[in-house]
Amino acid sequence: MSNVSKKKLSLPTVQQPAARWAFVLTVCASLGVVVSYYWRVFYGLDARGVSAAGVTGLCVGLAVLAGAAALALRRVRDFAKKGAACILLCGVLFAFANPPMQTPDETDHYLRTYAISMGRFDFDAQRGYPEDVDELVAAFPGAWVNAHTSAGLGTDPDTHAEQPFNSAGYALKQYGKDGRVESIRDSFEQYLTWLYRDSVPQRVTEPVSFLILPFLPGALGMALARLFGLGALGCLYGGRLVNLLAYTALCYAALRSAHKCRPAFLCIMLMPMSLYMGASLSYDATLLGCYYLMLALLTRDEWDDKTALFYALACVFANGTKPYINLLWVVLPLILRKSEWKVRLSRAVYAVLTAAGALALTLGVEQYGTLLRHNYGAIARQGGTTVNGGAQLLFVLKNPLRYIAVLLGTLYENDGFLGQLGLFGWKDMPIAFISITAPPVLLAAAMLCTAQTDTLGRRRMGWLGVFGLVYAVGAMTAMYITYTPVGMVRIVGLQTRYFLPVWLLLVLAAAAVLRRVLAPRLTAAKGETLAVTLCGWYAFAGAVLLFQHYFVGPVYTIYK
């Protein structure tokens, strides 16, 4: 064969990747234009004075970057690396789509993390922060949507009829038919212009938060941000990004450690709620990562010393971050058969030592917080004087049937918490699309785990199911005892993020059932490939929707 003919045969292999990139990026750019036009028309951005070129540029740029990332990840063959890349990239979008202080308790977490980044490893209620921190906290109250919600009676300008209004759940409010739109952008303007105003913000001091260890990643990010000359807002995003790196690293370790049902793990890690917490200043970022890592280790056929060590470290850390309820994780390695246990220590001794380490860290953290605490005085119980843990526990023990009714009623009122996977903010920012689609996406992930090689066995799956039920009831009971007024008929303070490891176990259980019912022919490798595509794009859509609901629309019109 001549050299000319060889060159002709090789041309398609050179041109095909370039053509694929050009086609995909063109489609993505077109979709970006469509989304920007939809935002401009449906949410009236032009009438609100928002630059059309800016909106179009943002949408097109983001869509093109997403397409480029998807094409680049096609070259990555390792599932764990590909999954970690999706978690990191989508997590960055969540870090910036989520306005400051809007993750539950993020104000306290921000203040504690900022203090640690300044080298403060003790706790002083009278110690303040730089003035720009005061301004940031004043500009962005926690539960921003609830703080800017109003209800009452107004007059419709078209029909002149009185009608009630309630702007709960809407981050953007328009006062009058053609009036000004109030949004969280006003808070950014308030913070960014604080140097030019005469008013002095209320001074903030260190919060009632006495943890150090889980806030170290965020503190490192804040220290780096200050090193580059960034202010309070830059420190917030710097802390979020390094916290996201910690979450990504733990998820990567979990994906590498999981020997079965890896699509289920990737799906729960890329759930918008998981990324929302992982890309915040909350200690849930590392806590969720530890949960996923421990469950991933339990998919291994055999345990050696290294596996046992990683599980013990994750379990001890989880207990140091959220004590007592996480002691339940100590018993999970006992579900392994004796033939599967290749660790030098016996299972019973290992469980006792892990429990001892968890309790030691828990008590050490409590003593550290007590001894290095200054000027706090008597700390009031959360929930007020009507909350009494001992009395509530006694009430539960005396009225077990009534408490079962309380559990069931709370689950019913909150859509089983599975239907609240799209409830963001301080439970004040509902995104209906995510709440509706998250359960089907989890079911799809279960279907991708139906390969025969992904089976965990009846014994292990059965005990994991029991653990999931006990953990869910335990989490609800803990909130009933510590946060809920004595005898109340519903449980106060529960959020769907507490149940994310339970939803992972539910997906594993659904996969076991579907494997028997459907007799699928899907291979594990094909399931993993489909999982990256499905869950990656779903996470991307979740970040875009979170940004849309906080900054673009829908807009609630209030008629006075």
Regions found by a protein language model. Name each.
Residues S280-L287:
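Short acidic/glycine- and proline-prone juxtamembrane loop motifs at membrane-interface regions
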Residues R20-A22, K81, L230-L233, Y252-P272:
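Transmembrane-helix signature of polytopic, membrane-embedded enzymes
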Residues G67, Y237-C261:
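Transmembrane-helix motifs of polytopic, lipid-linked glycan transferases
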Residues L363-A451:
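Membrane-lumen/periplasm interface segments of multi-pass, membrane-embedded glycan/lipid transferases
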Residues R120-L236:
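Interfacial juxtamembrane loops and adjacent helix segments
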Residues V34-G57, G357-L363, Y368-I379, A524-K560:
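Transmembrane helical bundles and short interhelical boundary loops of multi-pass, membrane-embedded
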Residues L297-W303, N326-G357:
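Perimembrane helix-loop-helix junctions
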Residues Y276, T307-P323, L327-L334:
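Membrane-interface alpha helices of multi-pass inner-membrane proteins
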